[in-house]
Amino acid sequence: MESPRDILKRHGLRAKYSWGQNFLGDEDALEAIADALNLRADEPVVELGPGLGHLTRFLAATGARVTAVERDRDMVMVLEKEAIPGVRVVSGNAATVDFAQVAGAPDVAVAGNLPYHLTSPILFRVLEQRAHVSRAVFTLQKEVVERLAAEPGNRDYGLLTVLLGMHYDAENVLTLEAWRFHPPPKVDSAVLRLTRRKSPRAPIIDEARFTRVVKASFAHRRKTLINSIKSDPTLGTTETLIAALEAAGVDPQRRAETLTPEEFAAIERALGPLTPATSTPAE
């Protein structure tokens, strides 16, 4: 396979540092990433930020129907000239893509070597569209993958860990050293696999309020749970929140990183039915 450096040179291009472009050209790593998605022949898969098409080729080799969504016009030009069989190239923003619409299918797999600065927007997008995303494999900054795959009680455990964990099983499947990329990033990367659960880990009354509960809980990580969660006045008074924590069986003096997704769900349920005053949308 032609290296990223050689493809860029052939097309008279350079990696755009401001776009976070670091191209993975290591064939063993690319094959492992494609294998981690467990694609079936003719299955729809959306690749976000395909760049020069290295992973795209391995995804297409599985027989899957690949839709490659790329924002950089130079990369779109390269992909169209390369004309990889079984691949449809779409110009678009990975952070706002409608997965089902772009793939023309109600349920899709998703893959991508994501620019680090777009990690959170894209993961939140997957959460928003989880009804259409059965599983995903993303190459991310190593410390981000470790955070997303962390267990309660780990200092890496945080907001997105809980929100993703309600609906997906997260696994750190592969570490990728910086030298495997062109140009090499300043830190190592890792591959995150998300597999949608058949049902959420625990029932909740309102998704937006659940998100607010988790956000408020992690807003001040060094504070106790009650002192952090009360920072969101839309959730209720301090007395209401203490009562909800106790009803959920959660000690108000604990810290957010020690709670399981199920415990956060119990807190949300303990806040009771929504009223017009408590139904403010999550930000």
Swiss-Prot record:
SMART domains named among the record's database cross-references: rADc (SM00650)
UniProt record similarity statement: Belongs to the class I-like SAM-binding methyltransferase superfamily. rRNA adenine N(6)-methyltransferase family. RsmA subfamily.
Protein name, as recorded: Ribosomal RNA small subunit methyltransferase A
Residues the entry annotates as binding S-adenosyl-L-methionine: 22, 24, 49, 70, 113
GO cellular component: cytosol
Enzyme class: transferase
Organism whose genome encodes this protein: Myxococcus xanthus (strain DK1622)
Molecular function, one GO term: 16S rRNA (adenine(1518)-N(6)/adenine(1519)-N(6))-dimethyltransferase activity
InterPro entries, alphabetized: KsgA/Erm, rRNA_Ade_diMease-like_C, rRNA_Ade_Mease_Trfase_CS, rRNA_Ade_methylase_Trfase_N, rRNA_adenine_dimethylase, SAM-dependent_MTases_sf
Record field: catalytic activity: adenosine(1518)/adenosine(1519) in 16S rRNA + 4 S-adenosyl-L-methionine = N(6)-dimethyladenosine(1518)/N(6)-dimethyladenosine(1519) in 16S rRNA + 4 S-adenosyl-L-homocysteine + 4 H(+)
